[in-house]
């Protein structure tokens, strides 16, 4: 029984070794895809950040905020979700393909009202989500909420 197991293990190791050598053959080096960026924001003529970045079938959407009146959480949440959706569409994805959302609230007291607008926006299989309240002034500009997300194509 032990000899039989050893024989099987030896064959398995030999097979894995052969596959490794075969995989290292000339010309089999995997091509690394180039990162694709969209909506680049410059600072003093130097690229600062992108509105979205795509690598393979993964899309990373930069934080979106609402910097307009009315300064009310439900209105800002609606604006931010629409901006996320527009950026996802430009990148070839959709709200239903979002895997992860980060929500940054200017005030944790806005949590429930933000949820009222947020619910149902990502289809029947919502993404995982992290929500944090940042210190006053922690959300850039005068937005009451900022969101970013990760999706696939």
Language-model segments: residues:
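Hydrophobic pocket/interface hotspot
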Residues: 84, 103, 114
